[in-house]
């Protein structure tokens, strides 16, 4: 008798493990059906357009409102763009965002760098 029950019990356990959500199906969230009923009472459906309006209204009621994305405050210097300097170092003149003290020659603003009309003299 025990050997006959063992395969059926194991198969039942396998089915229960494969479908875990079926045991929770008895608990139904009635807020969606209540919202649907209220919308039907307010405005009876007019064909497919009424159904679409009803469906979107129910979705709007169920989902929480989205928060706007985090806004980053940019300073005036960063909004204008980076400024570059010409530094004279061991290997000669070069572009850089910052120079060590004593080797800064010219300060080149961002707009002049974009125009590419700057002539780099050889020292």
Curated annotation (Swiss-Prot):
Localization per record: Secreted
UniProt keyword annotations, A-Z: Antibiotic, Antimicrobial, Defensin, Glycoprotein, Secreted, Signal
Keyword Secreted set for record: yes
GO BP terms: defense response to bacterium
Domain of life: Eukaryota
Major location (coarse): secreted
Annotated signal peptide: 1-25
A GO CC term attached to the entry: extracellular region
One protein family per Pfam: Sperm_Ag_HE2
Glycosylated position list: 29
Similarity comment: family membership: Belongs to the SPAG11 family.
Function: Has antimicrobial activity against E.coli. Plays a role in the defense response in the male reproductive tract, contributing to sperm maturation, storage and protection.
Name this polypeptide is given: Sperm-associated antigen 11A
Gene for this chain: SPAG11A
């Amino acid at each position: 008798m025990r050997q006959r029950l063992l395969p059926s019990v194991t198969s039942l356990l396998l089915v229960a493990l494969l479908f875990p959500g079926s045991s929770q199906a008895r608990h139904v969230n009635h807020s969606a059906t209540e919202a649907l009923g209220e919308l039907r009472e307010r405005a009876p459906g007019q064909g497919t357009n009424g159904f679409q309006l009803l469906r979107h209204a129910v979705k709007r009621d169920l989902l929480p409102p989205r928060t706007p994305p985090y806004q980053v405050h940019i300073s005036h210097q960063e909004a204008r763009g980076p400024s570059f300097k010409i530094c004279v170092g061991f290997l000669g003149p070069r572009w850089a965002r910052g120079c060590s003290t004593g080797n800064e020659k010219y300060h080149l603003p961002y707009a002049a760098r974009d125009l590419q009309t700057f002539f780099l003299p050889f020292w």
